[in-house]
Protein backbone atom coordinates (compact mmCIF):
# COMPACT_ATOMS: atom_id res chain seq x y z
CA UNK A 1 0.00 0.00 0.00
CA UNK A 2 2.88 2.38 0.83
CA UNK A 3 4.29 1.76 -2.63
CA UNK A 4 0.90 2.67 -4.07
CA UNK A 5 0.88 6.06 -2.37
CA UNK A 6 4.37 6.77 -3.72
CA UNK A 7 2.99 6.05 -7.20
CA UNK A 8 0.06 8.42 -6.52
CA UNK A 9 2.43 11.20 -5.42
CA UNK A 10 4.70 10.76 -8.46
CA UNK A 11 1.72 10.70 -10.82
CA UNK A 12 0.31 13.86 -9.23
CA UNK A 13 3.65 15.65 -9.64
CA UNK A 14 4.09 14.62 -13.28
CA UNK A 15 0.48 15.40 -14.23
CA UNK A 16 0.56 18.74 -12.40
CA UNK A 17 3.46 19.89 -14.58
CA UNK A 18 1.58 19.25 -17.86
CA UNK A 19 0.25 22.80 -18.25
CA UNK A 20 3.39 24.36 -16.76
CA UNK A 21 5.62 22.62 -19.31
CA UNK A 22 3.22 23.58 -22.08
CA UNK A 23 3.28 27.20 -20.90
CA UNK A 24 7.09 27.22 -20.97
CA UNK A 25 6.98 26.16 -24.62
CA UNK A 26 4.23 28.69 -25.39
CA UNK A 27 6.29 31.50 -23.85
CA UNK A 28 9.22 30.66 -26.12
CA UNK A 29 6.79 31.02 -29.04
CA UNK A 30 8.80 28.92 -31.49
CA UNK A 31 6.44 25.95 -31.75
CA UNK A 32 2.84 25.39 -32.86
CA UNK A 33 0.52 23.76 -30.25
CA UNK A 34 -0.44 20.94 -32.67
CA UNK A 35 3.26 20.38 -33.38
CA UNK A 36 4.07 20.20 -29.66
CA UNK A 37 1.44 17.54 -29.01
CA UNK A 38 2.50 15.48 -32.03
CA UNK A 39 6.11 15.34 -30.83
CA UNK A 40 5.28 14.80 -27.15
CA UNK A 41 2.84 11.94 -27.75
CA UNK A 42 5.17 10.37 -30.32
CA UNK A 43 7.84 10.17 -27.61
CA UNK A 44 5.32 8.78 -25.12
CA UNK A 45 4.02 6.17 -27.58
CA UNK A 46 7.53 4.97 -28.43
CA UNK A 47 8.35 4.50 -24.73
CA UNK A 48 5.11 2.57 -24.09
CA UNK A 49 5.61 0.41 -27.21
CA UNK A 50 7.74 -2.40 -25.63
CA UNK A 51 5.22 -2.86 -22.80
CA UNK A 52 2.32 -2.80 -25.27
CA UNK A 53 3.96 -5.44 -27.48
CA UNK A 54 4.59 -7.61 -24.41
CA UNK A 55 0.93 -7.36 -23.34
CA UNK A 56 -0.27 -8.20 -26.85
CA UNK A 57 1.83 -11.39 -26.77
CA UNK A 58 0.84 -12.35 -23.22
CA UNK A 59 -2.88 -11.75 -23.79
CA UNK A 60 -2.68 -13.14 -27.34
CA UNK A 61 -4.61 -10.14 -28.60
CA UNK A 62 -5.72 -10.07 -32.22
CA UNK A 63 -6.68 -6.55 -33.21
CA UNK A 64 -9.35 -6.34 -35.90
CA UNK A 65 -10.26 -3.42 -38.13
CA UNK A 66 -13.02 -2.57 -35.67
CA UNK A 67 -10.49 -2.47 -32.82
CA UNK A 68 -8.16 -0.20 -34.76
CA UNK A 69 -11.04 2.11 -35.69
CA UNK A 70 -12.06 2.33 -32.03
CA UNK A 71 -8.47 3.05 -30.93
CA UNK A 72 -8.12 5.65 -33.70
CA UNK A 73 -11.26 7.43 -32.45
CA UNK A 74 -9.91 7.45 -28.89
CA UNK A 75 -6.52 8.73 -30.06
CA UNK A 76 -8.05 11.55 -32.08
CA UNK A 77 -10.29 12.62 -29.18
CA UNK A 78 -7.55 12.48 -26.53
CA UNK A 79 -4.42 13.52 -28.40
CA UNK A 80 -5.42 15.40 -31.54
CA UNK A 81 -8.28 17.39 -30.01
CA UNK A 82 -8.26 17.48 -26.19
CA UNK A 83 -4.54 17.78 -25.49
CA UNK A 84 -4.02 20.15 -28.41
CA UNK A 85 -6.81 22.39 -27.08
CA UNK A 86 -5.11 22.33 -23.67
CA UNK A 87 -1.85 23.47 -25.28
CA UNK A 88 -3.75 26.30 -27.00
CA UNK A 89 -5.25 27.15 -23.60
CA UNK A 90 -1.86 27.73 -21.96
CA UNK A 91 -0.89 29.85 -24.95
CA UNK A 92 -3.65 32.31 -24.07
CA UNK A 93 -4.13 32.04 -20.31
CA UNK A 94 -2.22 31.10 -17.17
CA UNK A 95 -1.02 27.52 -16.70
CA UNK A 96 -2.71 27.35 -13.29
CA UNK A 97 -6.08 28.43 -14.70
CA UNK A 98 -5.87 25.92 -17.56
CA UNK A 99 -4.85 23.11 -15.18
CA UNK A 100 -7.72 23.75 -12.77
CA UNK A 101 -10.34 24.02 -15.52
CA UNK A 102 -9.08 20.86 -17.20
CA UNK A 103 -9.62 19.00 -13.92
CA UNK A 104 -13.35 19.65 -14.30
CA UNK A 105 -13.37 16.86 -16.92
CA UNK A 106 -14.57 14.53 -14.13
CA UNK A 107 -17.73 16.63 -13.90
CA UNK A 108 -18.43 16.48 -17.65
CA UNK A 109 -17.80 12.73 -17.62
CA UNK A 110 -20.98 12.19 -15.59
CA UNK A 111 -23.56 13.24 -18.23
CA UNK A 112 -21.59 11.46 -20.98
CA UNK A 113 -21.56 8.28 -18.86
CA UNK A 114 -25.31 8.63 -18.35
CA UNK A 115 -26.11 8.88 -22.07
CA UNK A 116 -23.42 6.57 -23.49
CA UNK A 117 -22.88 3.95 -20.76
CA UNK A 118 -26.37 4.27 -19.24
CA UNK A 119 -24.84 4.83 -15.79
CA UNK A 120 -27.22 6.16 -13.15
CA UNK A 121 -26.74 9.68 -11.81
CA UNK A 122 -27.15 9.93 -8.04
CA UNK A 123 -28.27 13.02 -6.15
CA UNK A 124 -24.85 13.50 -4.57
CA UNK A 125 -23.31 13.39 -8.04
CA UNK A 126 -25.56 16.24 -9.19
CA UNK A 127 -24.42 18.22 -6.14
CA UNK A 128 -20.76 17.69 -7.13
CA UNK A 129 -21.54 18.90 -10.67
CA UNK A 130 -23.26 22.06 -9.40
CA UNK A 131 -20.46 22.89 -6.94
CA UNK A 132 -17.76 22.39 -9.58
CA UNK A 133 -19.65 24.46 -12.17
CA UNK A 134 -19.99 27.28 -9.63
CA UNK A 135 -16.19 27.17 -9.39
CA UNK A 136 -15.89 27.41 -13.18
CA UNK A 137 -18.24 30.42 -13.28
CA UNK A 138 -16.26 32.15 -10.51
CA UNK A 139 -13.02 31.64 -12.47
CA UNK A 140 -14.74 33.00 -15.60
CA UNK A 141 -15.71 36.06 -13.52
CA UNK A 142 -18.66 37.12 -15.75
CA UNK A 143 -18.73 40.66 -14.33
CA UNK A 144 -15.10 41.18 -15.34
CA UNK A 145 -15.73 39.70 -18.79
CA UNK A 146 -18.73 42.02 -19.32
CA UNK A 147 -16.61 45.02 -18.37
CA UNK A 148 -13.88 43.92 -20.76
CA UNK A 149 -11.26 43.98 -18.01
CA UNK A 150 -8.10 41.93 -18.54
CA UNK A 151 -8.47 41.61 -22.30
CA UNK A 152 -9.87 38.75 -24.33
CA UNK A 153 -6.81 36.44 -24.21
CA UNK A 154 -7.74 34.99 -20.82
CA UNK A 155 -11.29 34.32 -21.97
CA UNK A 156 -10.03 32.58 -25.13
CA UNK A 157 -7.67 30.45 -23.02
CA UNK A 158 -10.46 29.55 -20.60
CA UNK A 159 -12.69 28.47 -23.50
CA UNK A 160 -9.90 26.30 -24.94
CA UNK A 161 -9.37 24.69 -21.50
CA UNK A 162 -13.07 23.90 -21.14
CA UNK A 163 -13.23 22.41 -24.65
CA UNK A 164 -10.21 20.27 -23.72
CA UNK A 165 -11.97 19.13 -20.53
CA UNK A 166 -15.25 18.29 -22.29
CA UNK A 167 -13.55 16.33 -25.09
CA UNK A 168 -11.35 14.50 -22.57
CA UNK A 169 -14.43 13.47 -20.58
CA UNK A 170 -16.02 12.10 -23.77
CA UNK A 171 -12.80 10.18 -24.45
CA UNK A 172 -12.80 8.85 -20.88
CA UNK A 173 -16.33 7.47 -21.21
CA UNK A 174 -15.71 5.93 -24.65
CA UNK A 175 -12.43 4.37 -23.45
CA UNK A 176 -14.25 2.62 -20.57
CA UNK A 177 -15.98 0.36 -23.07
CA UNK A 178 -12.89 -1.63 -24.05
CA UNK A 179 -9.79 -0.52 -22.13
CA UNK A 180 -9.95 -3.62 -19.89
CA UNK A 181 -9.91 -5.84 -22.98
CA UNK A 182 -6.67 -4.38 -24.35
CA UNK A 183 -4.99 -3.31 -21.12
CA UNK A 184 -3.66 0.17 -20.36
CA UNK A 185 -0.36 -0.09 -22.22
CA UNK A 186 -1.84 -1.46 -25.45
CA UNK A 187 -4.76 0.96 -25.37
CA UNK A 188 -2.66 4.07 -24.76
CA UNK A 189 0.27 3.17 -26.99
CA UNK A 190 -1.85 2.46 -30.08
CA UNK A 191 -4.28 5.34 -29.49
CA UNK A 192 -1.28 7.67 -28.99
CA UNK A 193 0.12 6.60 -32.37
CA UNK A 194 -3.23 7.21 -34.07
CA UNK A 195 -3.48 10.63 -32.44
CA UNK A 196 0.04 11.46 -33.64
CA UNK A 197 -0.78 10.35 -37.20
CA UNK A 198 -3.91 12.55 -37.22
CA UNK A 199 -1.87 15.53 -36.01
CA UNK A 200 0.84 14.86 -38.61
CA UNK A 201 -1.79 14.91 -41.37
CA UNK A 202 -3.19 18.16 -39.96
CA UNK A 203 0.27 19.75 -39.88
CA UNK A 204 1.02 18.73 -43.46
CA UNK A 205 -2.37 19.82 -44.86
CA UNK A 206 -2.29 23.22 -43.11
CA UNK A 207 1.39 23.86 -43.86
CA UNK A 208 2.33 24.07 -40.19
CA UNK A 209 5.86 23.16 -39.01
CA UNK A 210 6.56 19.52 -38.14
CA UNK A 211 10.03 19.54 -36.61
CA UNK A 212 11.26 23.07 -37.30
CA UNK A 213 11.41 25.30 -34.25
CA UNK A 214 12.98 22.66 -32.03
CA UNK A 215 15.99 24.20 -30.27
CA UNK A 216 18.26 23.44 -27.35
CA UNK A 217 16.03 25.75 -25.30
CA UNK A 218 12.86 23.73 -25.78
CA UNK A 219 13.99 20.18 -26.56
CA UNK A 220 14.47 19.35 -22.87
CA UNK A 221 10.90 20.46 -22.12
CA UNK A 222 9.60 18.34 -25.01
CA UNK A 223 11.54 15.31 -23.77
CA UNK A 224 10.28 15.85 -20.22
CA UNK A 225 6.67 16.05 -21.41
CA UNK A 226 6.98 12.96 -23.62
CA UNK A 227 9.00 10.79 -21.24
CA UNK A 228 7.78 11.76 -17.78
CA UNK A 229 4.28 13.20 -18.22
CA UNK A 230 2.96 10.96 -21.01
CA UNK A 231 4.89 7.73 -20.41
CA UNK A 232 6.33 7.49 -16.88
CA UNK A 233 3.36 9.40 -15.43
CA UNK A 234 0.93 6.89 -16.90
CA UNK A 235 3.08 3.93 -15.78
CA UNK A 236 3.00 5.35 -12.24
CA UNK A 237 -0.77 5.81 -12.48
CA UNK A 238 -1.25 2.17 -13.49
CA UNK A 239 1.07 1.21 -10.63
CA UNK A 240 -1.07 3.23 -8.22
CA UNK A 241 -4.21 1.43 -9.41
CA UNK A 242 -2.49 -1.95 -9.05
CA UNK A 243 -1.14 -1.25 -5.54
CA UNK A 244 -4.29 0.46 -4.20
CA UNK A 245 -7.50 0.73 -6.26
CA UNK A 246 -8.89 2.74 -9.17
CA UNK A 247 -10.86 4.95 -6.78
CA UNK A 248 -7.87 5.59 -4.48
CA UNK A 249 -5.60 6.26 -7.46
CA UNK A 250 -8.06 8.88 -8.72
CA UNK A 251 -7.04 11.10 -5.77
CA UNK A 252 -4.33 12.23 -8.19
CA UNK A 253 -6.97 14.46 -9.78
CA UNK A 254 -7.93 15.90 -6.38
CA UNK A 255 -4.30 16.84 -5.75
CA UNK A 256 -3.62 18.30 -9.20
CA UNK A 257 -5.64 21.60 -9.04
CA UNK A 258 -3.88 22.78 -5.88
CA UNK A 259 -0.44 21.35 -6.73
CA UNK A 260 -0.48 22.71 -10.30
CA UNK A 261 -1.37 26.15 -8.96
CA UNK A 262 1.45 26.11 -6.40
CA UNK A 263 3.97 24.88 -8.99
CA UNK A 264 2.84 27.55 -11.48
CA UNK A 265 3.51 30.22 -8.85
CA UNK A 266 6.93 28.76 -7.93
CA UNK A 267 8.17 27.85 -11.43
CA UNK A 268 6.49 30.41 -13.70
CA UNK A 269 6.03 33.20 -11.17
CA UNK A 270 2.31 33.39 -11.92
CA UNK A 271 0.10 35.56 -9.75
CA UNK A 272 -3.27 34.12 -8.82
CA UNK A 273 -6.32 36.36 -8.57
CA UNK A 274 -8.76 36.01 -5.68
CA UNK A 275 -11.64 34.78 -7.88
CA UNK A 276 -9.41 32.00 -9.26
CA UNK A 277 -8.48 30.85 -5.74
CA UNK A 278 -12.17 30.78 -4.75
CA UNK A 279 -13.02 28.92 -7.97
CA UNK A 280 -10.28 26.36 -7.29
CA UNK A 281 -11.72 25.73 -3.82
CA UNK A 282 -15.19 25.08 -5.26
CA UNK A 283 -13.81 22.74 -7.94
CA UNK A 284 -11.78 20.79 -5.36
CA UNK A 285 -14.84 20.50 -3.09
CA UNK A 286 -16.91 19.28 -6.04
CA UNK A 287 -14.22 16.73 -6.89
CA UNK A 288 -14.05 15.54 -3.28
CA UNK A 289 -17.84 15.06 -3.20
CA UNK A 290 -17.66 13.04 -6.42
CA UNK A 291 -14.68 11.02 -5.14
CA UNK A 292 -16.42 10.27 -1.82
CA UNK A 293 -19.52 9.09 -3.67
CA UNK A 294 -17.46 6.80 -5.91
CA UNK A 295 -15.49 5.45 -2.95
CA UNK A 296 -18.66 4.67 -1.02
CA UNK A 297 -20.16 2.89 -4.04
CA UNK A 298 -16.93 0.95 -4.51
CA UNK A 299 -16.84 -0.08 -0.83
CA UNK A 300 -20.48 -1.25 -0.97
CA UNK A 301 -19.69 -3.25 -4.11
CA UNK A 302 -16.77 -4.95 -2.32
CA UNK A 303 -19.00 -5.81 0.65
CA UNK A 304 -21.66 -7.24 -1.68
CA UNK A 305 -19.07 -9.32 -3.55
CA UNK A 306 -17.62 -10.61 -0.27
CA UNK A 307 -21.07 -11.57 1.03
CA UNK A 308 -21.98 -13.42 -2.17
CA UNK A 309 -18.64 -15.25 -2.12
CA UNK A 310 -19.15 -16.37 1.47
CA UNK A 311 -22.64 -17.65 0.76
UniProtKB/Swiss-Prot annotation:
Transmembrane parts of this sequence: 6-26, 33-53, 70-90, 97-117, 123-143, 155-175, 185-205, 219-239, 244-264, 265-285
Primary site of residence: membrane
EamA domain location: 12-141, 166-292
Annotated Pfam families: EamA
Subcellular localization: Cell membrane
Membrane topology, as annotated: Multi-pass membrane protein
Keyword annotations from UniProtKB, A to Z: Cell membrane, Membrane, Repeat, Transmembrane, Transmembrane helix, Transport
Superkingdom field: Bacteria
GO cellular component: plasma membrane
InterPro entries registered for this protein in UniProt: AA-Vitamin_Transporters, EamA_dom
Similarity comment text for this entry: Belongs to the EamA transporter family.
Name used for this protein in its record: Uncharacterized transporter CKL_3017
Organism: Clostridium kluyveri (strain ATCC 8527 / DSM 555 / NBRC 12016 / NCIMB 10680 / K1)
Amino acid sequence: MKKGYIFILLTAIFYSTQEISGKMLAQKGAMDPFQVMMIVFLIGAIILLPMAVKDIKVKKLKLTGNDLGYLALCGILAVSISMSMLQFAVTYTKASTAAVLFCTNAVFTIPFAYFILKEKIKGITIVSIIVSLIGVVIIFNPAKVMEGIGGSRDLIGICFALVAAVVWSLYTVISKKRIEIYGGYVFNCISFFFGVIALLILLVVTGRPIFSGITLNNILVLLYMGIFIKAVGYICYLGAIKETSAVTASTVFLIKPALATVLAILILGESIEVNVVIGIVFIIIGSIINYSSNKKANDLKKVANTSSAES
